[in-house]
Amino acid sequence: MFDMYIESGGKKLRCGYTTGSCAAAAAKAATYMLFNKKDISVIEIDTPKNIKLNLEIQDIQVEKNSISCSIVKDGGDDIDATSGLEIFAKAEEVEEGFELCGGEGVGVVTKEGLFVEKGQPAINPVPREMIKKEVLSVLPKDKGVRITIFVPRGREIAKKTFNPRLGIVNGISILGTTGIVYPMSEEALKESIRIEIRQKAVNNKDLVFVFGNMGERFLRERGYKKDNIVVISNYVGFSIECALAQGIKDLTIVGHIGKLSKIAFGCFNTHSRVSDVRLEVIALELTLMGYDLELVQKVLDQKTSEGAVRLLGEDFPMLYERIGEKVLNRLDIYAYGEANFNILMYYGSKEMKLLYESKNSNLFD
């Protein structure tokens, strides 16, 4: 077991290693065994973080002109759909040089805008370099080798990853910029968002941001079909910056009042541990509109913005319009006026109802 830990939220969490590290280790081990005619049980590789990994080799299969083996992906304490997967590499002798191929269970890129060209196996640039470096370190100088990375359960597990959203089909991606998996990594999630924005920006002049699956469901239930929706989690500011960097000038943000209202107070990370001003936004607007303090206090006594909306009912359109306009103003300030923003604000979960839609919104035209 990989014995490296970090602290997050007061908890000690075990790190893991990426699919890229697994592929590099399996490829190195298969190459070594092919040309040295002997089995090994452990292989050492370097990672871009300069952390050495000693990984156990599994499922060695010897054929006439090739050898394959696997490394089991260990995601540590991270919530990782690929943890426990066997990542295989097959090494075959060729006349000269180094070749890298993707086999069964490794996804294929079908859209422009990713770090790998359309039509190529979804093995990202850093893992490609890791695989090549490790293989060449054990490949005899006068020999050539073809490496095929394959993942028997890759098609099945890919359905639980970002790949379907990115247009990567038939398998998982071989990923990792550091070689190490850091549990609950904010940076890893942000990088996934950045990649999706970059990919969606290739064929779209406008993007629609949603905070999660609920926002996407809200749109799909109303017949929205365009492939320009990006799930941004809580990272509003970061996602706007990524979109602007890709030349996107028209952005629509669709979200529950509990998320969107935070932006009215200038909160561009909407996670509750960073910003929890949902009820205060509603209460302030009611006060400014002249409602009595008894009603304002009832709103503040609610546990959620959902509770506040249900308390008030749907007879406060001016309230939601005022909140919506403040959200739009904050978005405009954040982007220095470089983008056109629209918002759709809803409440509810099983049955979602629209509270406010900005005047220039045309999502359903």
From Swiss-Prot:
**What catalytic reaction does the record list?**
Co-precorrin-5B + S-adenosyl-L-methionine = Co-precorrin-6A + S-adenosyl-L-homocysteine
Q: What is one GO biological process annotated to this record?
A: anaerobic cobalamin biosynthetic process
Q: Which domain of life is it from?
A: Bacteria
Q: What are the annotated disulfide bridges? A: none
GO terms for molecular function, please? cobalt-precorrin-5B C1-methyltransferase activity
According to UniProt, this protein's pathway is: Cofactor biosynthesis; adenosylcobalamin biosynthesis; cob(II)yrinate a,c-diamide from sirohydrochlorin (anaerobic route): step 6/10
Q: What is its EC number?
A: 2.1.1.195
What is the main EC category here? transferase
The UniProt keywords, alphabetically, are: Cobalamin biosynthesis, Methyltransferase, S-adenosyl-L-methionine, Transferase
Return the similarity comment: Belongs to the CbiD family.
Q: Which HAMAP family match?
A: CbiD
Instruction: Report the protein name in the record.
Output: Cobalt-precorrin-5B C(1)-methyltransferase
Q: Which organism is it from?
A: Clostridium perfringens (strain 13 / Type A)
